[in-house]
Structure formats: C-alpha cells, structure tokens
A protein has these predicted regions:
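N-terminal BTB/POZ boundary and linker segment
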Residues: 1-55, 92, 99-110, 152-236
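Canonical BTB/POZ domain core
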Residues: 41-53, 59-128, 143, 206-245, ...
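Short, conserved phosphate-binding/catalytic loop or strand-edge motifs used
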Residues: 114-118, 136-139, 155
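Alpha-helical bundle protein-protein interaction modules that mediate dimerization/oligomerization
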Residues: 123, 138, 145, 157, ...
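Classical protein tyrosine phosphatase
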Residues: 129-133
Length: 299
C-alpha cells in the first residue's frame, strides 16, 4: 500500500504555491490600480522576492533613502529596475511601505506593525528624507499602542521572530520582551496578594499550589529561544523561580505534543530538523525547571 504522506506533502506544497502566486498576482494588480489612478506612466519596476511592482521613482526616492541611493549611485541614468531581495516582510511589507509613499491610507495594527517597522528601517524611511516618515510613524504606534498591553507586545514579538536580524537591530524584540516581563510581573504580584487568603499551607514559605496566570497561554506561541528570554527577563524583574513551573508545563504541553511517539518505543518517523527542534525545546525547558517542591502541583 502506498504511503499517503508524500502525496499529502506534495498536495500541501502545491496549494501553498498556488496561494502564494495568487497573493503576488493580487499585489501586482493593486499596484497597477495605483498607477492608473496617477495617470502617469510608471518609470521603475521594483522586484521584491518573486513579486514585481511597477511604480514611480519620485514618490519612492522622496521617502526611501535606500532606493534614493540605489538610483543616484547607478551608472544607468535611466535606471528602470530596482532589486530589493532582502526587504523584511517581503512583498507584503514593501507594498504597504509603497502605499505610504503614495499617500494611500491603510490600517496599522499589531499584526503588521513589526514588518512595517523593519521594512521602514531597511528602506531608510527616516525624518532625514521626509517629515513624518514611516520609521517615526511606526515607532509612535509601537510605543503608544502596541507595547501598552501584554497581548499587543506578545503579538508584535511573535511577528518579529520571522524578521530577524532587523527586528533585533531596531530593538523591537528586546522592547517587547521588557514590556511582557513588566506586565506579567505586575500581574503576578497583585494576583499573589489576592491568592494569599486562599492558601492554607506553605512549604518553606512557598505556596503549595501554583496557579497558571492568565498571560501564560499567550506565551506559548513564541519560539523556544524567545520564550526563554522572556522568562529570564521576568526573573530579573523579581518573578519567583518556583512560579515558572505551571508556565513551563503549559508551554511543554503545547510544543511537545506527540513526544512519546517520537522518542518512545516504536518511534514514529520524523524529519531530522523537527527532531532537533523538539530536543532543543525539551532541553531548554529542563534547564528552566524550578527546583522547589510542588512547583508542578496544578490540582
């Protein structure tokens, strides 16, 4: 009997490729609409990954320092093609940045702010080139909106994982981690005060039944190395090591599903990369385990 797994993988790959081509086609169609609305023929084609955008040099060079340099330093006086192979966030992020250059309104939110900030950095969209440029706009949203709530900070941090190293360069990762640690420790402090009256027994001064805090679920979407950095930041702010037990348990339950099938008897076949990732998760969690008794008593 034929193994259905390769067929499923091939089908999934085909569907992903089809969806990708459809998204790129939609992006190029939208840019064509921008050109038509300007009633001026495009004079530059910008290639970002597999997507091509037919645009105008003037709105781009007026706000994008990186593109201005490429145009000015080119030996071709009528440079008609610009390559941006390393734009963070790819075609989706560049499309939004281009819309900003054209003065087209779009909504900024926690789901796109990370790639917008990183794309703006890559394109050098600073105040040096235009007042109220994209770097300043995104920074204002990050500081005044995104990092004001734990959900916002976690969402931005989650999106930043695919935008390294630029997200590290603009300190987006470190700022999100600090904001999460601050909120989590603040919440833990007040919740522990509220629980004090319900705790009848202590083991060497420690609560005998740790409770999973409301924010712990949000952290399970983070990559293990980023998750570890969050916990280290929390402990540096005074979060008690023994309180990590329930948080680690929750993360392990989410990220190590099927572990017994992989490493136990009758091992299930798994790709080397996936096996390595699960090993790293397991080893990291073990290294973070609290040493106090009853740290995992969730009953």
């Amino acid at each position: 009997m034929a193994d259905p797994e390769p067929e499923k993988a091939q089908l999934s790959s085909s569907l992903n490729m089809s969806a990708k081509k459809e998204l790129l086609s939609t992006a190029m169609k939208r840019t064509s609409e921008w050109i038509f609305s300007q009633e001026i023929p495009s004079d530059v084609t910008v290639h970002v990954g597999e997507a091509s955008f037919s645009l105008h040099k003037f709105p781009l060079v007026s706000k994008c320092g990186h593109i201005r340099k490429l145009v000015s330093e080119s030996t071709d006086a009528d440079l008609a093609t610009v390559e941006l192979p390393n734009c963070p966030g790819g075609a989706e992020a560049f499309e939004l940045a281009a819309m900003f250059c054209y003065g087209i309104n779009f909504e900024i939110g926690t789901e796109n702010i990370a790639m917008l900030r990183c794309a703006a950095e890559y394109l050098e969209m600073t105040e040096e080139y235009a007042v109220g440029n994209l770097v300043g706009r995104t920074e204002a949203y990050i500081n005044e909106v995104a990092l004001k709530s734990l959900a916002g900070a976690v969402s931005v941090l989650h999106m930043s994982q695919s935008l390294l190293p630029t997200a590290e360069k603009v300190k987006l990762v470190s700022r999100c981690i600090d904001a999460i640690a601050f909120v989590a420790c603040k919440d833990s402090h007040f919740s522990m005060l509220g629980r004090a009256s319900d705790i009848g027994h202590h083991n060497k001064g420690l609560p005998s039944k740790p409770i999973v805090d409301w924010w712990a679920e949000d952290l399970t979407v983070l990559r293990i190395d980023i998750f570890q950095r969050v916990l280290v930041a929390m402990m540096s702010r005074g979060y008690k090591h023994y309180s990590l037990g329930p948080v680690l348990m929750l993360y392990a339950q989410k990220s190590l599903r099927g572990l017994q099938e992989v490493f136990g008897k009758g091992r299930k076949k798994i790709e080397p990369q996936q096996e390595h990732e699960k090993r790293v998760v397991l080893e990291t969690i073990v290294s973070l385990l609290p040493r106090e008794k009853n740290a995992f008593d969730l009953s």
